[in-house]
Structures are given as C-alpha cells and as structure tokens.
Amino acid sequence: MVSRRISEIPISKTMELDAKAKALIKKGEDVINLTAGEPDFPTPEPVVEEAVRFLQKGEVKYTDPRGIYELREGIAKRIGERYKKDISPDQVVVTNGAKQALFNAFMALLDPGDEVIVFSPVWVSYIPQIILAGGTVNVVETFMSKNFQPSLEEVEGLLVGKTKAVLINSPNNPTGVVYRREFLEGLVRLAKKRNFYIISDEVYDSLVYTDEFTSILDVSEGFDRIVYINGFSKSHSMTGWRVGYLISSEKVATAVSKIQSHTTSCINTVAQYAALKALEVDNSYMVQTFKERKNFVVERLKKMGVKFVEPEGAFYLFFKVRGDDVKFCERLLEEKKVALVPGSAFLKPGFVRLSFATSIERLTEALDRIEDFLNSR
C-alpha cells in the first residue's frame, strides 16, 4: 500500500487534462489544447546549439548540487542588476524547474504543522507540495470584483503562531493579474514585524504587458525573510529542459542545497549550460507575440459577453462560466474539441482557464467553437 499522505494528494489537474487532450490528438481528433502552461515557441536556437556543443565535448558529469558556479554567478548578476541587490552566487540554487525550487523551499522551511498562507485562485501544485512537506495551508480568497488583488488586512487577520510563510505568485497563474506595489510593501513590513517568510514565485515576470509590475525584490531590503523563485521554462520556452532557481539568504540556500544533494544530486548538466547561454538571449519577440495574442483573446471574449479580469502578465485568461465549471470543460472537450482547465482545479469554481500560448489561427478557431458552445447552452 502507498502512504496515506501520497494517497491524499491529487494528480496535477493541469497535467492530467493536458495529457488527455494530447491523447485525443494522437488518436486523430482535431482537439485545440488550451490547457498548456508552456510557450509554443521552440527553444531559442543559440540555446540548443550550446547544448549540442557541450554534449560533443563529452564532459557530462555530476555538478555541484547547487548548480554550476557560472550559472549561479550569471543569475546572481542578472537579478542583482535588475533589482539593485548585492547577490552572491552562494545565495542561488539551481533546481529541476521552478517547481522543484518551490518544493525544496517548503522542505527547508517547514516543520510539521507549520502554516503557509496562499491566495485563491491558487496554482494546482502549491497546496500538495506544502502538505507533502508537512505543512498546513490557510487560503485567502481573492475576488474578480476586486481584480483578484489580495488583501493585506485579511493576511494580518489570519497570522497565527504557526504561520511560517506567505506564498505569492505575480504575474499570477491562473488569473494573469499583477500584485500591486502597495500590497507587496505592506507584506514586507508585516513579514518583518511578525517574523514569517515571503515565498515569491515570479516565473512569469518576463511576460508582462503593463508598466506597473513590481517584484518582491523591488520592495525588500535583503533576503532575510525572502525566498525568490524563478526559472527558464516560461522566459525562454525551455519547459522540458527543467531549469529553475531559488535565491534567498545563504542559510536557506545551504538548506535547499542539502535537500538537493540527497534527492536529485544535481541538475542535468547539459541543461545548465544551455540555461547559461539563455541568459544572453533576448526574449522580447515572445513578449510581443503573447501581447498580441492576449489583446486578440480579450477583444473577442468581450464581444462574446464573457466576464473576466484582463491579464497583465503570463499567458492565461481566467473567465467566468455559468454552472459547474468541471462539467463545462468536460462538455466543451467532448462536443467542441477544445480543452480548458476548470477553475475548481485552482480552488475557484465557476471559472475556467484558457491558455493563449498558441497561434492566432488556432485561437480564432478555438474561440469560434467556444462561442458556438456558449450559444447552444
């Protein structure tokens, strides 16, 4: 028998639906899969070429569990310059995607029963990871009427002696909203006053369509109470390469490195050198293309009378539906061959998530089918 804690953890709903859509496509069905949490662009050619070059050298060996020094140094330099922070490579740990960076952070910080505050709608893997690490979860709901912006007052009201961290995700998955500077400033002050960590997942920070984006690093003085999470999957279309990273105090980074040394040993060596090259690659063409797609989907859904908050980042649009969102997605896939993710997967029933990480041509066809489906209900 498998352990109780694993039995109680659901499979990732987004991964499950993505696999279901791909299975139908493999059978020859004309399914438009808008569940994907990954860019549809190929990995930039210079990155692929660097991986090939490194493979041909034949030096594919274990690396430091924290990641190769050159990559940690490059990340520290880039993030340090962007946010005017003095960051040492020893504060950086390279991980198997940002997802492992998050899991390692929870494992490093949480004792049994420690609480993490999260905001709903919430990405599908946060809560299972916290539970697997022995923590408990307190969910703060956000609302479309308030543009899915979190409330500092609600956070303060929920703080208890076992609160170890507050987890934020901006730009947000699934809503696409960007958290306001005033909230982040207040959260930093509160963390210092009440002695908790802020874990900030900013994996979509390179895909922003507003001038108002604020990172937690813009408003924090240092890394004593901060764990910053990012990666290369979304910024450089490297989802399958599995390279993410964590930046925090040296104390937290050392703890995370210890975990990694006993789990994965290190990150794929070839992927690390590919990521090092990616630091030199401009991704502005991706941002512009996603912005055009976002604008297209927004205008089309407005004409359809659909209610939503316009995304400011990432590549998702989270819109309201009538009735059961799970049945909505099941019927849409069955009748119109369009795959979306129900809001219930993000603890927000009554909504669905659409990914616009595909071509305008396919988005046009998908929205035509969705409109037909809505009109037939």
Swiss-Prot record:
This is Aspartate aminotransferase. It is an enzyme of class 2 (transferase). Homodimer. The keyword Lyase does not apply. Its EC number is 2.6.1.1. GO terms for cellular component: cytoplasm. SUPFAM superfamilies: PLP-dependent transferases.
